């Protein structure tokens, strides 16, 4: 059994290539949250050296020409017309291409998070393959949709039209959110897709596998390619007489032994966090509920905790377990190669400037700090727009990544130092944040410009404080590591005089 598990891990690693392949996504309806906000959490996992930059894209007027992925050294040769008048929007993007924005909002208050890499059945891809040469990929989704979509539903519709006409260059899931609705979009094959509106009183979690089951044509809670059911019937992955109600995941998504160790456990773990009374086995992934009502209303803190999870306190803990046979069997949510994770929060009752906020942890969430980035921000402190795949002394990404790399040389010894300091920082920040938002709203009613100035001053101050703390922690861990190395090398020369 152990040999089969290890073989499946090796096989999955080989398949996972170079895109943002191993993400985990959580969506929470407004009536399932503790304050009436809609929440989205996602980790972006690929390569630890993939530095990120924070970008604010200004509004544009009278544009002509084409968006070109290739022109930015993107994934392929996908092109799409630029919007004549494009809205201002934000992204956290790849430092090299400035594409592949993991998360962002536009000036209409509409946001997206993407993508979740998913895999279709091989037999269907032979009939309707991905358009790897010129189809849309995660590199281009944010920069094509955010400047033009005025609602979550419009974003779903537009992406669906692109997939049906130009094709998907890969399999993906994308979150769309606005003041009223929360949608999740999944590709099936190169030109097939569906999307589902998230129930207000439930949450949804997915991990590198198609998870949407129900799809009903002409139902306002669903959208999809016009022949998505017929295609499955024609290609014998769905038989209405035998299978009953159409199940998109069962009809389109790959499901094999790799999912048992790589994908199912993450979904199961999150559901066990939010519904402790639910008893499930990691291996029963196809039986996991798609949507669930949490046993207690969920908060931003709950989603942060989920993004930091690594089977904590069990024999399967990827970093702290003493059981070498079990510690690396199941893929955790928080992994070292995560280059950023985020929690989006939409509070429609507040002005968009503070009502749309994204909490971002750069690098490995378990060893990072979540800071709130409000949509009213007009800029960042030094280092946020800098970076490359080579470590430097300027990029904010490398400020956090250097500390995480040091800690992972001896996780058990060094991680408590970092985690305790960041937990204290976040707790104190929550108090400051509540006070700031109260002051902002009082000012906003009298003078919006002064309120926005306050927002930017507050935000940049906490960016700097977190950066300073991280430098302090890096020096502290480096000092500890130096002392440990000194003791280790002295022991090698025991009885000798250096």
Where are these regions (language model features)?
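Substrate-recognition/cap regions that form aromatic- and gly/pro-loop-enriched pockets
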Residues: 316-445
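Short, well-structured alpha-helical segments that form the helix of a local strand-helix-strand
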Residues: 155-164, 303-307
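Sec/Tat signal peptide C-region and signal peptidase I cleavage site
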Residues: 17-22
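Bacterial N-terminal signal peptides that target proteins for export
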Residues: 1-8
């Amino acid at each position: 059994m152990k040999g089969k598990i290890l073989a499946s891990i090796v096989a999955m690693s080989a398949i996972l290539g170079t895109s943002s392949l191993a993400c985990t996504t959580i969506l929470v309806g407004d009536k399932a949250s503790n304050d009436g906000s809609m929440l989205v959490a996602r980790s972006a996992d690929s390569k630890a050296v993939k530095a990120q930059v924070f970008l604010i894209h200004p509004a544009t007027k009278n544009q002509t020409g084409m968006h070109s992925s290739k022109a930015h050294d993107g994934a392929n040769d996908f092109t799409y017309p630029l919007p004549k008048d494009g809205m201002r929007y934000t992204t956290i993007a790849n430092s090299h291409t400035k594409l592949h924005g993991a998360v962002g909002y536009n000036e209409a208050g509409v946001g997206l998070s993407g993508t979740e890499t998913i895999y279709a059945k091989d037999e269907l891809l032979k009939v309707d393959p991905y358009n790897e040469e010129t189809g849309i990929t995660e590199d281009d989704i944010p920069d094509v949709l955010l400047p033009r979509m005025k609602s979550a539903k419009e974003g779903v519709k537009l992406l669906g039209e692109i997939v049906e006409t130009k094709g998907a260059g890969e399999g993906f899931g994308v979150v769309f959110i606005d003041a009223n609705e929360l949608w999740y979009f999944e590709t099936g094959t190169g030109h097939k897709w569906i999307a589902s509106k998230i129930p207000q009183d439930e949450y949804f979690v997915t991990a590198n596998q198609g998870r949407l089951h129900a799809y009903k044509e002409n139902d306002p809670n669903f959208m999809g390619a016009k022949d998505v059911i017929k295609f499955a019937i024609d290609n014998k992955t769905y038989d209405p007489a035998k299978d009953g109600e159409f199940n998109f995941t069962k009809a389109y998504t790959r499901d094999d032994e790799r999912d048992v160790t790589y994908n199912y456990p993450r979904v199961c773990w999150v559901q066990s966090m939010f519904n402790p009374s639910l008893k499930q086995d990691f291996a029963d992934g196809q039986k996991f509920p798609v949507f669930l009502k949490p046993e207690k209303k969920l908060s931003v803190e709950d989603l942060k905790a989920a993004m930091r999870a690594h089977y904590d306190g069990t024999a399967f803990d990827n970093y702290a377990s003493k059981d070498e046979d079990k510690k690396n069997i199941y893929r955790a949510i928080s992994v070292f190669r995560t280059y950023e994770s985020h929690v989006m929060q939409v509070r429609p009752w507040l002005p968009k400037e503070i009502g749309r906020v994204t909490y971002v942890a750069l690098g490995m969430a378990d060893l990072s700090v979540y800071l709130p980035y409000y949509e009213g921000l007009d800029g960042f402190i030094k280092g946020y727009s800098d970076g490359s795949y080579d470590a430097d002394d300027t990029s904010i990404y490398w400020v956090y990544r250097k500390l995480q790399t040091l800690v992972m040389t001896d996780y058990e010894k060094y991680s408590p130092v970092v985690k305790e300091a960041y937990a204290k920082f976040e707790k104190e920040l929550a108090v400051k944040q509540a006070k700031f938002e109260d002051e902002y709203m009082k000012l906003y009613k009298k003078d919006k410009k002064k309120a926005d100035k306050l927002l930017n001053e507050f935000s940049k101050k906490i960016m700097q404080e977190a950066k300073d703390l991280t430098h302090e922690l890096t020096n502290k861990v480096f000092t500890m590591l130096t002392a440990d190395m000194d003791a280790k090398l002295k022991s090698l020369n025991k009885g000798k005089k250096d």
